[in-house]
Design a protein with these regions (language model features):
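Active-site signature of alpha/beta-hydrolase-fold catalytic machinery across serine-
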Residues: 54, 148-152
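Short beta-strand scaffold positions
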Residues: 42-43, 116, 140-141
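Phosphate-handling substructures
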Residues: 59-119
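Domain-level recognition of soluble alpha/beta enzyme cores
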Residues: 156-171
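Active-site-proximal alpha-helix that buttresses catalytic centers in soluble enzyme cores
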Residues: 1-61
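GST superfamily/GST-like fold recognition
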Residues: 143-147
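Glycine-rich phosphate-binding loop signature in dinucleotide/nucleotide-binding domains
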Residues: 32-36, 125-136
Length: 171
């Protein structure tokens, strides 16, 4: 994104041209085959929603924007690099990386609230898929959301969230 290597969370910054290209390349291979998606869901933050809007128009698929799919809110750490945070609050940053369920950045969203919000979003997606007879949808969201879903899918504690890889701009 335009803010580069910082904690962006709720910060609503746009993708860079490189980020936009990563997103396009991620779906390009899928577009070589008949598209299996019946709808596209996206976070409301522009780094996801702008690409989702263009893709939904291109594929003529419904687009459902859901604010519950937003990244975790990092509070006072929003827009700061981990180096900046480490210089100011080394103990808190280290504790947060090691056990995020126990340590919350100042004025940030606690991990249990983030988890509840994301689970609520995916329950709604599942409900709408059943109601519309959709078998497959594309969800365009953020690294933290993907990491949390990987934790939940593999029955790992949410404290493993920050140790799980999530490649950006990938399917």
């Amino acid at each position: 994104t335009e803010l580069g290597h910082t904690l962006r969370g709720y910060t609503d910054d746009a993708l860079t041209p490189e980020g936009w290209q990563q997103m396009q390349l991620a779906v390009l291979e899928k577009l070589q085959q008949p598209v299996q998606w019946q709808a596209i869901y996206s976070s409301t933050l522009i780094r996801c929603s702008h690409f989702a809007r263009q893709l939904s128009q291109q594929l003529k698929l419904p687009l459902i924007l859901n604010s519950d799919l937003k990244e975790m809110n990092f509070g006072q750490w929003e827009g700061c690099s981990t180096e900046e945070i480490y210089q100011r609050e080394p103990e808190l940053l280290t504790s947060f990386w090691e056990k995020p369920s126990f340590y919350t950045p100042p004025e940030a969203e606690p991990l249990h609230e983030f988890q509840y919000r994301i689970q609520r979003a995916f329950q709604l997606i599942h409900q709408q898929m059943l109601e519309n007879n959709w078998r497959q949808v594309l969800v365009i969201c953020h690294g933290g959301v993907i990491k949390l879903m990987k934790c939940l899918a593999s029955d790992q504690s949410s404290d493993h969230l920050l140790k799980i890889p999530a490649e950006l701009g990938q399917l």
